[in-house]
From Swiss-Prot:
SUPFAM superfamilies, per the entry: PP2C-like
GO biological process terms, semicolon-separated: regulation of intracellular signal transduction
Protein name: Probable protein phosphatase 2C 43
Binding site for Mn(2+) 1: 84-85
Residues binding Mn(2+) 2: 84, 284, 343
Stretches assigned to the PPM-type phosphatase domain: 53-352
Length: 388
């Protein structure tokens, strides 16, 4: 077959295949509209941002949703935040209410966005939450044990700024010349299951033989927590927030000599390339059940509409399969009970339309979309329109 004819045939077949997949999903209830009876699954599609569109989905497993998340759109910039809380929702909720505002304030003061500004926004958020802990821990000691992972992406002037604490993850789907999609992980997982993280902790704490402990087949810091970086978790950062023996799960047998967790984010900068098709931002509940490559292939091979929801459901189906169950069985379970089968999961898929990235789109709606909240509000990122 002539090369030009082969390319046309391939493109036509790709469209037919995608249509068939969509029809199949509509018929078997696995598409975005076929699971209205899963009351713990929320989604929002498709919303414009300055350089394309995004799809957003959250499923609740815990009795109280510990994942908080947001997308802020403006004519000049787009902000994506995924905050996977643990021990409670206070830290993830606090981040959702303050981090983007700190970033906008600092960017306006400096007249730009940079790695330092992102780092300082994280620092201000950590300081603010620790101040809250200091004011309330005598009344509610457990707040010292509450923390959150924090994954943030900012798209501004053709560049993606990424910052990460914990094991939420950002992955890019890159198109090859043969129209194949390849996953590239952009963030590092700060989790004690990773050998490099254990080595880092041991080098920072050479006098502490219990800095990482293998407990019931899982590596944990001080035998308690898996993530090595977070907002909050004050009891593992400052001795003043040590918890007494009555809270056995979080009690340390010896006084804290130095912080064992840090709030210093890993920061990455990526100039967007023409082959960067989309980005997936997700809490670890997704990555527990799907590989990076599986996730990008699902996005690449299906319509944009409902794609974040589709990813969440793919993870839930895999979680069900591991327990020799079906997704239909899991979605009938109540919140709290579902946590025995899967975690809270947040997914934001951000599509990049490179024509918009180059030319800009001043008509982009400036809105704030929050996970599991149906109504949108004004975006704080409208304040970035004037910076150069």
């Amino acid at each position: 077959m002539w090369p030009w004819l082969e390319r046309i045939a391939s493109a036509c077949w790709d469209r037919v295949r995608r249509y068939a997949l969509t029809r199949r999903d509509e018929e078997d209830g696995s598409g975005s509209g076929g699971d209205a009876d899963d009351l713990l699954l929320w989604s929002r599609d498709l919303v414009r941002h300055a350089a394309g569109e995004f799809s957003f989905a959250v499923v609740q497993a815990n009795d109280v949703l510990e994942d908080h998340s947001q997308v802020e759109t403006g004519a000049a910039a787009t902000f994506i935040g995924v905050y996977d809380g643990h021990g409670g929702a206070e830290a993830s909720r606090f981040i959702s209410n303050h981090l983007a505002a700190h970033l906008v304030r600092l960017a306006q003061e400096r007249g730009t966005i940079s790695e330092d500004i992102v780092r300082n926004a994280f620092s201000a958020t950590e300081e603010g939450f620790l101040s809250l802990v200091r004011r309330t821990h005598l009344i509610k000691p457990s707040i010292a044990s509450i923390g959150s992972c924090c994954l943030v992406g900012i798209i501004w002037k053709g560049t993606l700024y990424l910052a990460n604490l914990g094991d939420s993850r950002a992955v890019v789907g890159c198109l090859t010349g043969s129209n194949k999609i390849v996953a590239e992980q952009l963030t590092r997982d700060h989790n004690a299951s990773m050998e490099e993280v254990r080595q880092e902790l041991r080098s920072l704490h050479p006098d502490d033989s219990q800095i990482v402990v293998l407990k019931n087949g899982v590596w944990r810091i001080k035998g308690i927590i898996q993530v090595s970086r977070s907002i909050g978790d004050a009891y593992l950062k400052k001795q003043e927030f040590a918890l007494d023996p009555s809270m056995t799960r979080f009690h340390l047998s010896e006084p804290l000599r130095r912080p064992v967790l840090t709030s210093e984010p890993s920061i990455y900068t990526r100039v967007l390339h023409s082959q960067d098709s989309f980005f997936i931002f997700a809490s670890d509940g997704l990555w527990e059940h799907l590989t990076n490559q599986q996730a990008v292939e699902i996005v690449h091979n299906n319509p944009r509409e409902g794609i974040a929801r589709r990813l969440v459901k793919a993870a839930l189906k895999e979680a069900a399969r591991k327990r020799e169950m079906k997704y239909n069985d899991i979605k009938k379970l109540e919140k709290g009970v579902r946590r025995f089968f899967h975690d809270d999961i947040t997914v934001v898929v951000v599509f990049i339309d490179h024509e918009l990235l180059q030319d800009g789109d001043e008509s982009t709606p400036e809105i704030s979309v929050r996970g599991f909240v149906d109504s949108g509000g004004p975006s704080s990122f409208s304040g970035l329109n004037g910076i150069s």
